From Swiss-Prot:
Record's protein name: Vacuolar protein 8
Lineage of the organism: Eukaryota, Fungi, Dikarya, Ascomycota, Pezizomycotina
One BP term from GO: piecemeal microautophagy of the nucleus
A Pfam cross-reference name: Arm
One cellular-component annotation, GO: membrane raft
Organism: Aspergillus oryzae (strain ATCC 42149 / RIB 40)
Function (record text): Functions in both vacuole inheritance and protein targeting from the cytoplasm to vacuole.
Keyword Repeat (UniProt): yes
UniProt similarity note: Belongs to the beta-catenin family.
Gene name of the encoded protein: vac8
One GO MF term: identical protein binding
Disulfide bonds: none
Membrane topology label: Lipid-anchor
C-alpha cells in the first residue's frame, strides 16, 4: 500500500530539487550578487549551512541520517529562520526519496518538528519526507510512538491540496501496520480522512480512500469507521472514474460487509450498492472485478442479498468471471455464486443461467483447493431442493467427475464431494444411475478416511443409496470388496462407539434387510460380527428419565431391534420404568 502516496510525494520532483536546495542555501551561506548579506544568521547556523552545502556536493557518499550531516540539518530545522527550515525540509524530502531505511528518533524528531511549522512549503516537504520514511515497517511504529499523528491530522485539514495529499499519503502508509491501526482509529483521523475522500483532487482522493481501506482489517476499526460515516462516501465513490479509487472503495466495502451488523446497515441505507457492484464486475480492470465479486460474496452471507444479486442481473457477469483464465477472478466468482446458491429460490435461476457445466469443469481444471470446494459446494446447493435439479446436476457430469477425482483431492474437497453425492442419492430416481456409475468404488474406501467428515458423508451416501433402490445386485457384489466392502463398513461403524456412526450403520442395515434380496439378507445373517454388535446395541438399557439419550441412543436401539426382528432374533424388553 506504500505506493498509494507516490502521486503526492513526487510532487516536488518537478524541479531538480538538489539544485533548488543549493540555490536556496547559497545566498544564506555567503554573499549575494550585489555583495550584501541578505540574511543574518547565528554563527552555528552559518556553519551548518556551509557544512550542508559541502555534504550536498558529495551527497552520493554522505549519510544524512546520522553524525555531522544530521546535526547540520537539525540546526537548520530548529532555526527561527523559515528559509533554513524550508531548505532542511526539502533536503529531508529528497534524501528520503532515494534512501529509505530504518531510522531512529534523532532523525524523526526534526521532521516531526517541521510538520508543526505554519509555512506551507515546510509542511509540504516535511510530510513528504515522513511519508517516504513510513514505507519502512519499523519507522511506521516509531513515527506514531513519537506523536506523529496529531500534526499529520492538522495537515489533513490544511487548505493547501499538496499538504493534504502528503499528509494523507503518510497516514495511509502508517495504517498498513497492525500496531498503528487502532491508534489511528482513536486519534481523530477518520473524520478528516472521510472528508478528504470526497476531495476534487484525485491524488488526495486516492490516498484518503487507501487509508480508509487500511482501517477495515479489524472488527473494532471497521465499527469506528462505520460510526464515523464512511459507508455513504465509499458507496458513492464506487462510481468514480479512477480505477484505484474504485478498487480501494470496493475492497473497503467488502471488508465492512464481513460483519452482520454492517450488512444490516448497508441493506437499510444503500439501495444502489448491489447494482454498483454488479456493474463493477464488468470493469476492464481485473482487481476491481475481483473485489466487486468478493464484496457481493460477503453481502450474500445474508438471505436478502442472495436474492437481490440475482434480481440485479448479477449472474451473467459472475458466469463470465467464472470462465476467466485468471485464477483470482475465478476464485472470487465461485465463492460468490456458492453463497448465492444457498437460497432455494436461486437454484433454478443459477442452473438456467448456464453455471452447471463450468462448475463441473472447475473440479478438474484446477488443483486450487478453495476453488474446488466452492464449486462442488455450489453444485450440492443447486441439487438440494428438487429432483429436477438433482438430475440436471447429474447430467452435467458432476458425479462422474467426483468419482474420478475424489480419491486424489485434499480432505476438504473430499468432504464436499461426498456430501454432494449424499444429497444426490436422496432422489429415488437417480439411485440406479449413481450405482451404475460405480460410486461404491470410492464411497466404501472413504468410510475409512482419516477425516471424520469424509467418513460420515460417505456412509450417509451409502445409506441413502441403500433405501428403496429396487435392484440390490451391486450391494451383493460389493458385500466384501473393495476395502472390506459393505460388510467392512458396517462392522467399523457399529464398533466405533459413536452414536451418529452407529445410527447411520444400523439404519443402512435395516434398509438392506428390507430389500427382500435373499442373497443380501443371507450375507448379513452369516456375518456373525455384525449381528453380534447389533444384538449388543439392542440389549442396552435406557432409563426413561434420560431424555437426552432417548432422542439419539434410544432411536439407535429401536433400529437395532427392528434389524433383529428381520433376522429372526426378537429383542428382549429392556426398558426400565422409572
Amino acid at each position: 500500500m506504500s505506493g498509494i502516496a507516490s502521486a503526492c510525494l513526487s510532487c516536488l520532483s518537478t524541479v531538480d530539487r538538489w539544485c533548488h536546495i543549493t540555490a536556496c542555501l547559497g545566498p544564506i551561506g555567503g554573499r549575494s550578487r550585489d555583495g550584501i548579506y541578505e540574511t543574518t544568521l547565528a554563527d552555528n547556523e552559518r556553519e551548518a549551512v556551509s557544512d550542508l552545502l559541502g555534504y550536498l556536493e558529495n551527497r552520493a557518499e554522505t549519510d544524512f541520517f546520522r553524525g555531522e550531516p544530521l546535526s547540520a540539518l537539525s540546526t537548520l530545522v530548529y532555526s527561527d529562520n523559515v528559509d533554513l527550515q524550508r531548505s532542511a525540509s526539502l533536503t529531508f524530502a529528497e534524501i528520503t526519496e532515494r534512501d529509505v531505511r530504518e531510522v531512529d528518533r534523532d532523525t524523526l524528531e526534526p521532521i516531526l518538528f517541521l510538520l508543526q511549522s505554519s509555512d506551507i512549503e515546510v509542511q509540504r516537504a516535511a510530510s513528504a519526507a515522513l511519508g517516504n520514511l513510513a514505507v519502512n515497517a519499523d519507522n511506521k511504529v516509531l513515527i506514531v510512538a513519537l506523536g506523529g499523528l496529531a500534526p499529520l491530522i492538522r495537515q489533513m485539514m490544511s487548505p493547501n491540496v499538496e499538504v493534504q495529499c502528503n499528509a494523507v499519503g503518510c497516514i495511509t502508509n502508517l495504517a498498513t501496520h497492525e500496531d498503528n491501526k487502532a491508534k489511528i482509529a482513536r486519534s481523530g483521523a477518520l473524520g478528516p480522512l472521510i472528508r478528504l475522500a470526497k476531495s476534487k483532487d484525485m491524488r488526495v482522493q486516492r490516498n484518503a480512500t487507501g487509508a480508509l481501506l487500511n482501517m477495515t482489517h479489524s472488527d473494532d476499526n471497521r465499527q469506528q469507521l462505520v460510526n464515523a460515516g464512511a459507508i455513504p462516501v465509499l458507496v458513492q465513490l464506487l462510481s468514480s472514474s479512477d480505477v484505484d479509487v474504485q478498487y480501494y472503495c470496493t475492497t473497503a466495502l467488502s471488508n465492512i460487509a464481513v460483519d452482520a451488523s454492517n450488512r444490516k446497515r448497508l441493506a437499510q441505507t444503500e439501495s444502489r450498492l448491489v447494482q454498483s457492484l454488479v456493474h463493477l464486475m464488468d470493469s476492464s480492470t481485473p482487481k476491481v472485478q475481483c473485489q466487486a465479486a468478493l464484496a457481493l460474496r460477503n453481502l450474500a452471507s445474508d438471505e436478502k442479498y442472495q436474492l437481490e444479486i440475482v434480481r440485479a442481473k448479477g449472474l451473467p457477469p459472475l458466469l463470465r468471471l467464472l470462465q476467466s483464465s485468471y485464477l483470482p477472478l475465478i476464485l472470487s466468482a465461485v465463492a460468490c455464486i456458492r453463497n448465492i446458491s444457498i437460497h432455494p429460490l436461486n437454484e433454478s435461476p443459477i442452473i438456467d443461467a448456464g453455471f452447471l457445466k463450468p462448475l463441473v469443469d472447475l473440479l478438474g481444471s484446477t488443483d486450487n483447493e478453495e476453488i474446488q470446494c466452492h464449486a462442488i459446494s455450489t453444485l450440492r446447493n443447486l441439487a438440494a431442493s428438487s429432483d429436477r435439479n438433482k438430475e440436471l446436476v447429474l447430467q452435467a457430469g458432476a458425479v462422474q467427475k467426483c468419482k474420478d477425482l475424489v480419491l486424489k483431492v485434499p480432505l476438504s474437497v473430499q468432504s464436499e464431494m461426498t456430501a454432494a453425492i449424499a444429497v444426490l442419492a436422496l432422489s429415488d430416481e437417480l439411485k440406479p444411475h449413481l450405482l451404475n456409475l460405480g460410486v461404491f468404488d470410492v464411497l466404501i474406501p472413504l468410510t475409512e478416511s482419516e477425516s471424520i467428515e469424509v467418513q460420515g458423508n460417505s456412509a450417509a451416501a451409502l445409506g441413502n443409496l441403500s433405501s428403496k433402490v429396487g435392484d440390490y445386485s451391486i450391494f451383493v457384489r460389493d458385500w466384501a470388496d473393495p476395502n472390506g466392502g459393505i460388510h467392512g463398513y458396517l462392522k467399523r461403524f457399529l464398533a466405533s462407539g459413536d452414536p451418529t456412526f452407529q445410527h447411520i450403520a444400523i439404519w443402512t442395515l435395516l434398509q438392506l434387510l428390507e430389500s427382500e434380496d435373499k442373497r443380501l439378507i443371507s450375507y448379513i445373517a452369516k456375518s456373525d460380527d455384525v449381528v453380534h454388535m447389533v444384538k449388543s446395541i439392542s440389549d442396552k438399557n435406557i432409563e426413561s428419565d434420560e431424555e437426552d439419550q432417548e432422542d439419539g441412543e434410544g432411536e439407535v436401539i429401536a433400529l437395532a431391534r427392528r434389524c433383529l426382528e428381520f433376522l429372526g432374533n426378537g429383542p428382549r424388553q429392556t426398558l426400565v420404568e422409572a
